[in-house]
Every structure is written in structure tokens, then in C-alpha cells.
């Protein structure tokens, strides 16, 4: 008698892999359309057509357009390598931690700057996306606050408290500054990262 259990297990794995591929194809199709046409001008039906799936499949995978964008946001930091950032933060002194954070932001903006800009602009008229953008921004601020608050007393420059340090970082390392330096001033992403690293040390640390 032949045991059919392995076959059933393989079939389950195949279905799971296919479902993951379908989700990825839908997400990539949505990103292309959102960036090219804008959030408001893109319908779920168009996303389905672009991905080569049915409309119910899109809804089953992500719920709605906001669910699609949230999934894109969750995946956006993967190319930026958050594990690398974590490792660098755990073992570095403050100047190196700032450099690690600048490097992460550079990688994030390089790979997903178009998506970040889309969400922020669409959030001006779409409440769900405004909420999403605010949540992401606050999460980033929270990480910076956690890092800065762990530094020994006297690490920050005189007159710079924790809140000011977080604000200063956000004012320097953001998608607008990155975009201007890359598109208008002709800088390379690596040069932006190096400049951020140097200016953050000058602005934040007592040296």
C-alpha cells in the first residue's frame, strides 16, 4: 500500500507557494499603478487586471486598497535591511549609530521613496492614508527616541534635549531632502548617506 501523506503535504506547500506568489504579484501590480496613476485614480479592478487575477482574489488577499498600501509599507523596509540596522545599533557608539540610521534611511528611500511620497501626497485627501503615514512616521520617531535615550548623559550637545534631537534627525533625514539632493543636485545615494552621517554628528553630539 502506498502512503499518500507526503503527496498531500507537497500539494499543500505548492498551494501555499502559489498563494504567496499571487499576493506578491498583486502587490507589485498595485505599486506600479499607484505610482504611475496615483492612489485615487487606481481601482481595485485595474489592479486585478494588471496582476492577471480576479477582483475577488485581490479582496481576498488584501481586503481593499488601503490594505494593499499597508502591505506595501510593511514590505518596503526589507530591501533596506532592518536586520543590518539592528546589528549595527547594538554594537556601536553614538556616532556609528547615527551613521547606521542614516544608512538605513538612504536604503529605504532609494528602494521605496516613490511609495513613501505617494502615501504622503494621497494622505492629503484620503483619511486612511493620512493615518497610515502618521503611524509610520511615529514609529520611526519612536525608534530614534529609543536609541537617543539610551545614550549616556552628556552625549547630546548642550541645549539639545531628546525631543529636539528627534526633530533634528527628522528634519535632516527625510524623503524631501533625499529627493532634492538626488534629482536636483545630482548627488549619489552614497554621498547623501555620508553627508547625513557627518551633519548628524555635528548637530547632535557633544564633540
Please place each PLM-identified region on the residue numbering.
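Alpha-helical DNA-contacting segments of helix-turn-helix folds
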Residues: 69-76
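Residues in the recognition helix of alpha-helical DNA-binding motifs
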Residues: 61, 71, 195
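Short loop-to-helix capping motifs
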Residues: 64, 112, 125-126, 175
Amino acid at each position: 500500500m502506498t502512503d499518500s501523506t507526503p503527496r498531500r503535504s507537497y500539494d499543500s506547500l505548492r498551494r501555499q507557494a502559489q498563494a504567496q506568489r499571487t499576493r506578491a504579484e498583486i502587490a507589485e501590480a498595485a505599486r506600479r499603478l499607484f505610482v504611475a496613476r496615483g492612489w485615487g485614480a487606481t481601482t481595485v479592478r485595474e489592479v486585478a487586471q494588471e496582476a492577471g487575477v480576479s477582483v475577488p482574489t485581490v479582496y481576498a488577499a488584501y481586503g481593499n486598497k488601503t490594505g494593499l498600501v499597508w502591505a506595501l509599507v510593511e514590505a518596503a523596509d526589507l530591501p533596506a535591511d532592518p536586520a543590518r540596522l539592528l546589528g549595527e545599533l547594538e554594537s556601536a557608539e553614538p556616532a556609528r549609530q547615527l551613521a547606521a540610521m542614516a544608512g538605513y534611511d538612504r536604503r529605504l528611500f532609494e528602494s521605496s521613496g516613490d511609495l513613501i511620497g505617494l502615501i504622503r501626497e494621497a494622505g492629503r485627501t484620503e483619511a486612511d492614508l493620512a493615518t497610515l503615514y502618521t503611524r509610520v512616521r511615529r514609529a520611526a520617531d519612536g525608534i530614534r527616541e529609543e536609541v537617543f535615550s539610551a545614550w549616556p548623559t552628556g552625549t547630546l550637545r548642550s541645549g539639545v534635549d531628546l525631543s529636539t534631537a528627534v526633530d533634528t534627525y527628522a528634519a535632516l533625514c527625510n524623503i524631501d531632502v533625499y529627493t532634492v539632493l538626488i534629482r536636483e543636485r545630482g548627488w549619489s545615494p552614497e554621498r547623501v548617506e555620508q553627508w547625513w552621517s557627518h551633519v548628524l554628528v555635528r548637530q547632535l553630539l557633544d564633540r
